[in-house]
């Protein structure tokens, strides 16, 4: 009987990131598909699913292979999205690429969230198949709530008349945090709030300075849990995500599911998926953001949330669970075919 080990080694470090949320989504997807899973390596299982690139995940994959189990490795990270992140990340990017290549090749199959990230990984010369499959979104859980909106605005002292711009992510340059702060300076009539956190030792000096910016309309409250973040989506007038590089961006799926208008950067991962002026608004830099942001907030541009919600339904947890089941079946079908060929020799 099929059973999956969702290995959670490294989650103490990655649990507050998109990888942590991705693991939650995988568990829900397997549950919806009726596929048994466990987080306990001591239980019986025949597939291990790995999500981090810490040494313990590589070790777990190698151990599972030695025991004849199948290994599914999620390619959440690329060299490209490692750059412009933590202190020293640009200097270490080449080493990071070699390391993640070693990790990913320990799997029987590599799953990565988008066709864009699959194309990137395929340029690394990986010797294992790479499959594009969204991290997914639990549409039953992510529902816009008037009560949640009220809680959020009361908690952060936003009046009903003020427009609120929401940002979510680590305190890293890649997430576009510098542009977020700059827009807060340009538009004092709007409130800006960014949820997320990063250990201070890993934050580059210019990002640390940006987060300490003192403006009456700018807040950095730190990390919040899923429920409070859903309240924030419900109570915000715009999700501003000026990220410079993503493999998908789970927060993008969350905002679309919560029917919060989205303004993001026009980057390759969203080409052919998120259409400017149809599902989201996209800008190339501060000049575009400065023009689009007030037009969205003041209703001078059409509200796109209905079309965005229709699109994000393609990323539903139910569909992701069915797709995972197909990937698992393919792994064992290959094993049976190889066994049959050996018997014929």
Language-model features: locations:
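Short alpha-helical donor nucleotide-sugar binding micro-motif in glycosyltransferases
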Residues: 104, 223-224, 231-236
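Conserved acidic donor-binding segment of nucleotide-sugar-dependent glycosyltransferases
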Residues: 276-287, 294-300
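Membrane-proximal helix-turn-helix segments that form the acceptor-binding/catalytic region
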Residues: 91-110
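Conserved donor-binding/catalytic core segment of Leloir-type glycosyltransferases
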Residues: 158-175, 181-185, 193
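Glycosyltransferase donor-sugar binding loop
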Residues: 168, 191-206
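Aromatic "clamp/platform" in nucleotide-sugar-dependent glycosyltransferases that forms part
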Residues: 244
């Amino acid at each position: 009987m099929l059973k999956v080990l969702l290995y959670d080694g490294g989650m103490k470090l990655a649990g507050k990131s998109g990888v942590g949320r991705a693991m939650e989504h995988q568990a829900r997807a397997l549950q919806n598909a009726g596929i048994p899973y466990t987080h306990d390596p001591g239980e019986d299982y025949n597939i291990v699913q790995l999500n981090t690139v810490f040494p313990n995940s590589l070790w777990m994959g190698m151990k599972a292979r030695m025991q004849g189990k199948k290994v599914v490795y999620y390619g959440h990270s690329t060299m490209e999205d490692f750059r412009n992140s933590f202190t020293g990340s640009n200097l270490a990017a080449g080493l990071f690429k070699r390391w993640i290549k070693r990790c990913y090749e320990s799997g029987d199959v590599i799953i990565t969230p988008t066709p864009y990230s699959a194309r990137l990984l395929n340029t690394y010369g990986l010797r294992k198949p790479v499959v594009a499959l969204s991290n997914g979104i639990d549409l039953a859980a992510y529902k816009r709530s008037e009560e949640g909106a009220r809680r959020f605005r009361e908690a952060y002292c936003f009046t009903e008349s003020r427009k609120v711009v929401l940002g979510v992510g680590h305190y890293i340059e890649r997430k576009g945090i510098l542009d977020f702060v700059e827009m807060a300076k340009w538009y004092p009539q709007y409130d800006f709030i960014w949820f997320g956190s990063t250990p201070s030792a890993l934050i580059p000096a210019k990002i640390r300075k940006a987060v300490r910016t003192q403006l009456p309309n700018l807040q950095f409250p730190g990390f919040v849990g899923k429920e409070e973040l859903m309240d924030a989506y419900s109570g915000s007038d715009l999700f501003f995500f000026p990220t410079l590089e993503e493999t998908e961006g789970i927060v993008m799926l969350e905002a679309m599911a919560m029917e919060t208008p989205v303004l993001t950067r026009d980057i390759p991962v969203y080409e052919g998926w998120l259409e400017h002026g149809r599902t989201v608004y996209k800008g190339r830099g501060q000049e575009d953001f400065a023009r689009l942001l007030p037009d969205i907030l003041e209703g001078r541009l059409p509200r796109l949330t209905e079309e965005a919600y229709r699109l994000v339904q393609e990323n539903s947890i139910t569909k992701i669970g069915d797709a995972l089941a197909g990937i698992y079946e393919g792994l064992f079908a290959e094993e049976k075919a190889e066994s049959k060929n050996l018997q014929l020799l």
